[in-house]
Amino acid sequence: MLKLIFSDLDGTLLNSVKKVDEKTAECIKNLDGTRFIINTGRLPYNVDDLKSFVDLSNMVCGNGAYIKIDNKVVYNCFTDKDEALALLDYAYSHDLVPRVFTESNFYITSTPNLSTFVKPVVLSKDELNDLLKKEGVYKICFMEEDPNTLKAIEDFVRANNKNMVFEYSTPRFIECHHKDTSKGRAIDVVSNLLNVPKDEILAIGDNENDLSMFDRGCHSACPSNASDKVKATVEYISDLDCDHDSMVDIIKNFM
């Protein structure tokens, strides 16, 4: 019997137009004795539109940086301020556009070809730097088409930020956050808090920032649209993708 299900959002629970399919919503609603917990890179202010489909009194956000259980925040971890500012300086000097997610909102310095489900607040570089000195920062992200640009960001983080790590939520979207946060570590925190053994937990995801969920000793699964790295790691691969109720198939397989 599963006691906890942790699910990624984009590409997993949500379909390609960022919605929860009707059959999936009904399946989650009918879970009896099992907590369904979103485990996402999004921040709390980016998931409010899901409250009619999932119980948001329990959630993992910011790739494990923010954990709420029974409406109580049980874990909250920001990036090192000096390292965050250094990464912004690197971005400015290389004409990159950082996407900065703080405790209050999503900020950006310009909006070239911006495609996002959340409208950011646009600030000048100086305004953004000043804000980071006052607010906690969960993560700094970059969307880049050029693999060499992404590799350069990786190299900078490795060389200069001892408290920061990076991972990819899509092949061209890199997310930089504190080393003590991950979706997998969040599973450890919640399972210990609720005293749920790992063999009663299911983790579901589709991309590389979900990989840390799959080495925790719990059950694991992915939709057919998942990355090859994820497919090589999980216990069960659905024949269905996120546009065809893969979540329903996965839950039925383990229940």
Task: Describe each PLM feature range.
Residues 2-16, 214:
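Asp-based phosphoryl-transfer active-site loop
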Residues 16-114:
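Active-site phosphate-binding/coordination module
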Residues 25, 29, 211-215, 231:
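Alpha-helical segments flanking ligand/cofactor-binding loops in enzyme cores
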Residues 54-55, 63, 160-162, 216-217, ...:
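Short, structured coil segments at secondary-structure junctions
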Residues 54-57, 76-79, 114-119, 183-185, ...:
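Short, hinge-like loop/turn segments at secondary-structure boundaries
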Residues 90, 94-97, 101-216, 225:
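Conserved acidic, metal-coordinating active-site core of Asp-based
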Residues 197, 216, 220, 226-255:
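Asp-based, Mg2+/Mn2+-dependent phosphohydrolase catalytic module
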